């Protein structure tokens, strides 16, 4: 189990990403636009740097929904490999079963 504080930190990051998503997208559009003047581009870069660091989606970490484990995460199921195996053995994942050949 991950510490509760780590889960809370990830939840806070997710909230910040959602809050600043439109603002970040607008600033990045100005920066990447070839029609933007150098002054406008530079102002957009400074404004982007002034935003909270955790508002960037790249700082988020995928975690298991049940345990909060950061490694061995399978995006399709939202679970870590360990919890996915346990759920599969209990028959809770439709269409998934232990391999046998």
Curated annotation (Swiss-Prot):
Family: Belongs to the universal ribosomal protein uS14 family.
Protein name per UniProt: Small ribosomal subunit protein uS14
Gene this protein is translated from: rpsN
GO cellular component assignments: cytoplasm; small ribosomal subunit
Subunit structure: Part of the 30S ribosomal subunit. Contacts proteins S3 and S10.
The keyword Metal-binding belongs to this UniProt entry's keyword annotation: no
Pfam families: Ribosomal_S14
InterPro entries: Ribosomal_uS14, Ribosomal_uS14_bac/plastid, Ribosomal_uS14_CS
Record-level GO BP terms: translation
UniProt entry keywords in alphabetical sequence: Ribonucleoprotein, Ribosomal protein, RNA-binding, rRNA-binding
PROSITE patterns noted in UniProt: RIBOSOMAL_S14
Gene3D superfamilies according to UniProt: 1.10.287.1480
Originating organism: Shewanella amazonensis (strain ATCC BAA-1098 / SB2B)
Top-level lineage group: Bacteria
UniProt-recorded Gene Ontology molecular function terms: rRNA binding; structural constituent of ribosome
Positions of transmembrane segments: none
Taxon lineage: Bacteria, Pseudomonadati, Pseudomonadota, Gammaproteobacteria, Alteromonadales
Function: Binds 16S rRNA, required for the assembly of 30S particles and may also be responsible for determining the conformation of the 16S rRNA at the A site.
């Amino acid at each position: 189990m991950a510490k509760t504080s780590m889960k809370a930190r990830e939840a806070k990051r997710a909230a910040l990403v959602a809050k600043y998503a439109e603002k970040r997208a607008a600033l990045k559009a100005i920066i990447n636009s070839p029609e933007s003047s150098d002054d406008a581009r530079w102002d957009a870069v400074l404004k982007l740097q002034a935003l909270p660091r955790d508002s960037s989606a790249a700082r988020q970490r995928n975690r298991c929904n049940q345990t909060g484990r950061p490694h061995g995460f399978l995006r399709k199921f939202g679970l870590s490999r360990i919890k996915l195996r346990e759920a599969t053995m209990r028959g809770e994942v439709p269409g998934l079963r232990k391999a046998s050949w």
